[in-house]
């Protein structure tokens, strides 16, 4: 019995030492998250929310599945380009040259795009409306977006929506799900590293609804500029 008690005591001490070591690693990781958070150009409300979420992570056991979910969420927040913008080149004649060089014809379309850029230049408002390009395959809808990005010197993102039938692909998953991931729009913004890319939603007419939800409704919500933002 004495040998058994000694062995149990020894094993408990080993477990305690391992937990202490894991805790030290967890503290370093949390400190690193806080340091990265201080470099972000976000609002005081967002900074407060971030600190609240980091504190929640601090209280979570590193062996718990919730720890990885919370950590992924915080890493996603840090990966977003908060108030990071590329400088626009709103030179209308340069934009016209770029469009003419890349596309032959399409005069009405190019004229409408140039009008849009001219209004954007006059207003100086980043909240520009969405342009819808429609037509048969192969007429240059997607490549026009690439030319606009090149003319403005903005980052270019193309996101194909063909066959998308799950709302979670647009909006992302709830944090309560194991393996929860952000939606494709958030992922592409992280990839671009800029808050003002030219964002092409390709094949939007091929979005289909099924039992998993209606992605078009999720798109309306995500692309609405009115909700409160941080």
How would you describe each model-predicted region?
Residues 1-119, 123:
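Extended, charged alpha-helical coiled-coil/arm scaffolds that mediate oligomerization and mechanical coupling
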Residues 11, 73, 113, 140-142, ...:
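Conserved RecA-like P-loop NTPase ATPase core
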Residues 127-161, 190-191, 220:
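Walker A/P-loop
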Residues 159-165, 204:
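A short hydrophobic beta-strand->loop->alpha-helix junction that borders the nucleotide-binding pocket
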Residues 176-201:
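Conserved alpha-helical scaffold flanking the Walker A/P-loop in AAA+ ATPase domains
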